Amino acid sequence: MIDERKRKILMAIVQDYISTAEPVGSRTIAKKYDLGISPATIRNEMADLEEMGYLEQPHTSAGRIPSVLGYRYYVDYLMEKPSLSREEEEFIRKVYEDKINSIGDLLEKTGKVLSSLTRYTAVVLSPEAGKVPLKHLQLVLLQPGKVLLIIVLEDGTLHHRAFEVPGDITAQDLEKVSAILNAKLYGVNPEKIRYSLIKEIYYELAQHQNLINITLELISNLNQDNQEHKIILGGLINLFNQPEFKNVEKVKTLLSILEQEEKIREIFSQLNVGVNVKIGSELNLKEIEDCSMIAAGYFSYGNSVGFIGVLGPTRMEYAKTVATVEFLSKYLSEIIGNKNF
């Protein structure tokens, strides 16, 4: 149990270490923070906090730094409720006033804004096609025996697949099939097409069963074939400007991890709804246990389709970063919902 005095000392140490990147001693706390207690008392309390697992002592210093547990306690119980200033919110809105032509452009811009405001590295996971509702389908006859399937999702993204069909299928057949598929599948998530819906489609288009089989399979497999579902990084240099990453080997290791998209996806797959704060070892990836990630999902028509996040040192400005990620995730969802690109 941490009493009020220990809470104040822990808060002072975390805040001081975040701003200076230097281990914090009892004299520093006594001078800089008006806690009304002597350096000796602070020293004893710091020793207790270390024994409880909230502080660590670097080998080369007499001062202390927060442990993962210390940061976690700070984020959960001590940190002031985060919010952006009106000027910062206005800055974000103005950035998005420029014309955005695609979801890719939108996410690239988001990565730049996120890294600029936080001064850390932005990590953006683009939408999973299978989680975005269908808006329009069109089957087009390219030549006898070859058809193009055009898929438009509610977030504005466009997908197309060409495939072979029996040579006697006509453009009129494709118009009829397209009309029925649009009537049945509008607003449906590609990965959640119900069996009952498939039965209805088969019933109305019994004479085109082979065409329907191929079309539905292509729609259902959007995620597997989706080349746009990727990781976007912004402000990578920001991470390497941090004192913690001046070591060349650390930089190499971190770069190696960031190049392995499946590992970043694995981190995102562990996240819950809302803003997530993962600190050090909580990321479950030894190579980046000196880092923290703050991330949140963004939505399209109520469905979580991707994530935005910030990767930085465990010595991160948590309150400011949480506020930025929270605001941007909501604003990004709003833009996607309004299809302003």
Swiss-Prot record:
Molecular function per GO: DNA binding
Signal peptide bounds: none
Transcription regulation keyword on record: yes
Cited SUPFAM superfamilies: GAF domain-like, Winged helix' DNA-binding domain
Key words, A-Z: Repressor, Stress response, Transcription, Transcription regulation
Keyword Transcription regulation included in the entry's annotation: yes
GO biological process terms held by the UniProt record: negative regulation of DNA-templated transcription
Biological role stated in the UniProt entry: Negative regulator of class I heat shock genes (grpE-dnaK-dnaJ and groELS operons). Prevents heat-shock induction of these operons.
Family affiliation: Belongs to the HrcA family.
Name this protein carries in UniProt: Heat-inducible transcription repressor HrcA
Organism encoding this protein: Carboxydothermus hydrogenoformans (strain ATCC BAA-161 / DSM 6008 / Z-2901)
